Every structure is written in C-alpha cells, then in structure tokens.
Amino acid sequence: MPTKTKKRSVLEAERKKIGLDHAPKEDESVDDNFPKQFKRLLQQKEYHESKKKEIKKGNLKNKKKKDYGKIQRLPGERLSEFSQRVNKAIPVSFKSGPSKIDEFTDKKEKKKIAKRKEKRERDWNEIEENFEDKTWEADTTGQFIQIESRKKRKNSPDPWANLQTKPSFGETVQAPPELPELKIKETKYLENVPKVNNMGQTESMARRQALGKQRLELIEKYRELMKTKRK
C-alpha cells in the first residue's frame, strides 16, 4: 500500500507559506475565537458597571410604574374569568423580613394550642369566681388575715453565717462549742408481721406498723389475763 503521508519537501514548502505563528496584533479582531457564553458574561459585567456609574452620578431616572387603572367587570363576563384578569393585573408582592415560625406550623397544631389556652383561661376564671373574699374581716375588725399568695417562698436562714465572721487578733476560746441535741427517731423493726396479706397483696409500711402495735397490745392483754387466772 502506498503511504499517505506527504514528503518532507512538500511539508517544508507549506510551512514557509504559512509563516511563523506570532501573537495577534491590536488591529486584528480576536472576538471570533471567544465562546458565546463568555461574551455574554463580559457584556453583563460592562452593563452593570456602567449602571453603577450612572447611579453615582445621578443620571439614572426611576422607572415609572404602570398605571393599571380601575379594573371593571365586562358585560357577560364570568366571575372566574374576571378574578383571573384581576390576579394577572395585580403585581405580586412578597413579604420582606424574616419568616415567623407560625407560618410553618400545622393548622391542627395551632387549633390544639388555642384550645389549651382557652381552657386554661376558663379554669383560672372559675377559680377566681369561686375564691372567697377574706379581706372583709380585716376591713371591719382591723385584724390582718394572711392570704395564700403565689409568690415564691423565701430562702431559709444560712446556718453557717456565723463562720463567715473572722476572729479578731489575739482572741482565745473560753469553752468548747455546745452542739444541740439531735432528735433521732428510734427505728422499730416489725417482727412476725407478714408483708403480704391473705389476699396475696403487699401491705404498706404504715399498715404493717399499725398491725404490729395491735399485736403487741393483744399480747400484753393476754399476759395480764393469764396472770390473774394463776392467782
């Protein structure tokens, strides 16, 4: 098969005709080599920059708003068609500013929250109506009657407040501190008192203590009777 490549002499002659690949001159147009999308971006950039300059100078005029006029219903026109025409004529306006949480909550949850608030207010109103006025005695007799308030209870006094005072220089202790006697309740262990009753139900501690007391009382009475019989 004959070779399809050109001879060396032919290739060198073609290169001499083309010449060297120099950079394009200022007069030559290079726009044809750019892609169209890149050209659009350049045009947009130039447009925005020119607009900013005009705004700074104050040459840019505000656009006049369209005067829609009064929209009236045409004779023989349906209400649905008229409403569509009105919606098209009215410009769409979006809310500015941060969105609220209530806009995204479900309608059912909103109703539940509203019902709870109403019930709470109703209960408070009933309590206030049923609340007896106890101030009439204070008005007539002049005696102060303490009424329960919703204020928080005051804090109890600090038992270690005395330790905060620093001793003076050269102070000596005359006697050891006297500690108050602690009232310790004697723990009574209940013996022979079952934890479960005849029905198989567990008994509480208070119930078992009461049964233990009754058992001891009966034992003492029985012993007294036996002593009297022996005599």
Curated annotation (Swiss-Prot):
GO CC terms in record: nucleolus; nucleus
Bilayer-crossing regions: none
Subcellular location, record wording: Nucleus, Nucleolus
Highest taxon, organism lineage: Eukaryota
Q: Where is the composition biased (Basic residues)?
A: 53-67, 109-119
The keyword Methyltransferase is assigned to this record: no
Q: Which UniProt keywords apply?
A: Nucleus
Do the record's keywords include Nucleus? yes
Quick one: where's region Disordered? 1-33, 47-68, 93-132, 147-178
Locate the compositionally biased regions of type Basic and acidic residues.
Answer: 9-27
The UniProt entry's sequence similarity note says:
Belongs to the UPF0653 family.
Protein name as annotated: UPF0653 protein C607.02c
Which organism's genome codes for this protein?
Schizosaccharomyces pombe (strain 972 / ATCC 24843)
The taxonomic lineage of its organism, from the top, reads: Eukaryota, Fungi, Dikarya, Ascomycota, Taphrinomycotina
